[in-house]
Regions:
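N-terminal glycine-/serine-/threonine-rich beta1-alpha1-beta2 phosphate-ribose binding loop
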Residues: 4-113
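Oxidoreductase and adenylate-handling cofactor-binding alpha/beta cores
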Residues: 156-169, 180-192, 222-236, 331
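ATP-dependent carboxylate/acyl-activation modules
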Residues: 290-366
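Substrate-binding/catalytic subdomain of NAD(P)-dependent oxidoreductase enzymes
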Residues: 196-294, 299-301
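Short, ordered loop/turn segments at secondary-structure junctions
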Residues: 63-65, 83, 99, 123-125, ...
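Rossmann-fold NAD(P)-binding glycine/threonine-rich loop
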Residues: 104-110, 123-160
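A short hydrophobic/small-residue beta-strand
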Residues: 118-119, 394
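A conserved regulatory-domain signal marking ACT and ACT-like small-molecule sensing domains
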Residues: 332-442
Length: 442
């Protein structure tokens, strides 16, 4: 039996060598691009087995082909001519890992018009232009895979478009930025400052040299826009996602959070509210016993609420080239398996404009404030009066003296009962005008 099977496999492999390979055009050779190149080379037999046809890298778009040729240990087909690569008859699938909006969007559009299937991990492009790209791809009869644009190693797009497709998703709550989750986990566990935790993340390769895109919430907002659009089948634009980063969070906040029974995470939240969607990214206090509180390091996790599944959570690594490469190759296999299907029809989901976006003003939730104030009699009464006038009700108050050689200073931490966002923002404006307030820290 083994001899017959081995002979069959050998014959199958021999036949594969006669089959026209699937041509791949790779746009970009940075960290993710290098991961894709290595995987295409190292997993060529596995890809052939999974797809049923061999895969061949026909060209790699870079800015300076000479430099790449000089520094590469193996002979690779580097090119600076994007149009020639994308429109080549030998290329079937374009993998875009350039990052950023331009020139990526123009090149993806060229690929679609040239009847090429596309795999991209570009969160900014998909957040800003995803609806139009999917529509145009359907019109041209090509597929777009974009699993790598959201959850790293979490196959969330596949889950939403296939396994959970019969669910009416009503809410998404997620940790979807590995860099910020690593920073916050480090600050929580070791008491590190924000800058120290960021530096460590950069040293370990979990954060870019310029990490503002991550720490200010933009990266998570792009991902939430994509995730919400797919989950609700309605276009949620990145500009409609409120975002607040983690730069103002200090080690003290983690001490107080633990004292109150919480941990701090950068959450991405979107919910259906009637015919509206409210999407937001901001630091949040999560109860210690909540599943998301256990998601640490570079891991991501995505919670979904659906009418059939009720509740589901997917978790996996969210930073580094490995998880994104895994998602890209998964999309490549999915498209590759369909290339030989008779009468291939594109099955990109169409994202309509069913729901309008809600601003944050009338959001009702609980709040946390940390203040530095002059340590004088009557200060708390003034703060309480301002909050009360704005219909913000106090839940807990912690006050501690802090060292300040210039003058006596106290640190006050306040949590509130559910209050309107606009009421809280008005209260903060009023608090800043009080002469007893030295700083609103977070």
């Amino acid at each position: 039996m083994m001899m017959i099977l081995s002979g069959f496999l050998a014959k199958l492999k021999g036949n594969m060598n006669k089959v026209k390979p699937i041509g791949i055009g790779l746009l970009g050779a940075g960290t993710i691009g290098a991961g894709v190149i290595n995987a295409l080379e190292g997993k060529s037999d596995l890809l052939t087995e999974r797809i049923g046809r061999p895969v061949k890298l026909m060209g790699i778009l870079v800015r300076n082909a000479s430099n790449h040729h000089a520094s590469s240990n193996i002979d690779l087909p580097f090119t600076e001519n994007a149009e020639a690569l994308i429109t080549s008859d030998d290329v079937d699938i374009i993998i875009e890992v350039l990052g950023g909006e331009h020139p990526a969007i123009e090149l993806i559009n060229l690929a679609i018009k040239s009847n090429k299937h596309v795999v991209t991990a570009n969160k900014e492009v998909m957040a800003k232009h995803g609806m139009a790209l999917l529509h145009n791809a359907n019109k041209e009869g090509v597929l777009i895979g974009y699993e790598g644009s959201v959850g790293g190693g979490i196959p969330i797009i596949s889950a939403l478009t296939h396994q959970l497709a019969t669910n009416e998703i009503s809410a998404v709550q997620a940790i979807i930025n590995g860099t910020t989750n690593y920073i916050l986990s480090n600050m929580s566990a070791g008491g590190a400052s924000f800058n120290a935790a960021l530096n460590e993340a950069q040293m370990k390769g979990f954060a870019e040299a310029d990490s503002s895109y991550d720490v200010n919430g933009d990266d998570a907002a792009y991902k939430l826009a994509i995730l919400s659009s797919v989950a609700f089948r309605s276009a949620i634009h990145d500009v409609d996602v409120f975002r607040e980063g983690i730069e103002s969070i200090g080690p003290e906040d983690f001490i107080y959070a633990k004292e109150l029974g919480y941990c701090i995470k950068l959450l991405a939240i979107s919910k259906l509210e009637g015919q509206f969607v409210r999407a937001r990214v901001h630091p949040s206090l999560i109860p210690m016993d909540h599943p998301l509180a256990q998601v640490n390091g570079v891991d991501n996790a995505i919670e979904l609420e659906g009418d059939l599944v009720e509740w589901s959570m997917l978790q996996g690594p969210g930073a580094g080239s490995g998880p994104t490469t895994s998602a890209i190759l998964g999309d490549l296999i999915n498209i590759g398996q369909k290339l030989d299907s008779a009468g291939l029809k594109p099955n990109n989901i169409e994202i309509a404009s069913k729901y309008k976006s809600l601003p944050l003003d009338d959001l009702e939730t609980k709040y946390y404030l940390r203040l530095h104030v002059k340590d004088l009699p009557g200060v708390m009464a003034k703060i309480s009066r301002v909050l009360g006038d704005m219909n913000v009700s106090l839940a807990t108050v912690i006050q501690k003296e802090i060292d300040d050689e210039a003058e006596s200073t106290a640190e006050i931490v306040i949590t509130t009962h559910k209050s309107l966002e606009k009421s809280m923002q008005n209260a903060i404006k009023q608090l800043k005008s009080l002469d007893v307030i030295k700083a609103i820290c977070s």
